[in-house]
């Protein structure tokens, strides 16, 4: 992440290079045929451990809540820890066996992959799209947050009810929706639309998610530049989250929270599909394993719960490393998901609604290190105003504006 964030205070390289792979040829196989072709051996894994260990990670969680969130640096932050270990026989057969098990266990993953980077390998089943754009310019983002760790027998109605009525889990999801609305408000030609919420059920976890859709005329490079990185793996506001990560991260993030993307060139345009690199195992040339996971920390977080959430997120990879694959379970809780939508602003969920009246004139929004300004801009444009956003406006600019809006930013509102 640090290589992409050169302009942020978090410039801290971890030795993980940006990699572009030119596809010379491709072959498409059905999931069923691929599963038949892949090997299935039990990998020899040893020295499994968490870095940092539970107690140390819990102390870190408390420091971030008490000092960074309470101190006004931001509303939520994601700090990773890693499951570490050693692959006894680091062979392609072992790697493909892990990939096969993830493919079997996690049919709901957005993208499942084995990717040879030259010096290391990434194997993962990511639940989360980063951004997708088709050749016509239709664009989608997929904020996911909130985690229900299933019981050993699978998800239950009682467990789903407790999860979907938990205010902390609801607030976590709404925070990341706001952050990705900021991104799409910056990228899209017109206001983006919210679809959802939905339950994203994985083999051993359930998350909640929304889809945000819109249309853009931006090129791929600008879409990636303006959308990196997802708040679900970093926090918000994004600038503050970079700073907190630089201060608090115990181990290098490497590819955690980056993206694995595919760009295709068509006669009528360029398309992009990408997944966030979470739930991803990195294996280096010596067979060292690294599986980073994180928890979203908010003011109401409890250290013990966040520690448990991170260990819960390693259950699938532990099963892929040590157990035969198992199937998933049916979803529950659709009515409770629908109730969550009641708290969302209709501007983002019902784009067909016309404003009760239109305005004219010029609005100037002062940007104070929080991209909520771009959401405000889309709302004011919808009302008929001509809007400009500036982080350092001249006094004359403010004088000429019919409406001056001071955008939000980091800090403690009680100061």
Model-derived regions: residue spans:
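Non-catalytic accessory segments adjacent to catalytic cores
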Residues: 1-89, 93, 189, 195-198, ...
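Contiguous alpha-helical scaffold segments within structured protein domains
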Residues: 25-48, 86, 148-151, 155-246, ...
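An anion-binding catalytic pocket shared by soluble metabolic enzymes
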Residues: 78-171, 186, 263-293
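Short hydrophobic beta-strand that contains or immediately precedes a catalytic carboxylate
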Residues: 79, 175-177, 365
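Conserved hydrophobic core element of enzyme catalytic domains
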Residues: 213-334
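Hydrophobic multi-pass inner-membrane translocation pores used for secretion
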Residues: 250, 324, 360-365, 369-372
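RNA-binding accessory domains that recognize and position tRNA/RNA substrates
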Residues: 330-368
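Flexible gly/pro-rich beta->alpha loop and the following alpha-helix that scaffold active-site loops
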Residues: 362-363, 370-415
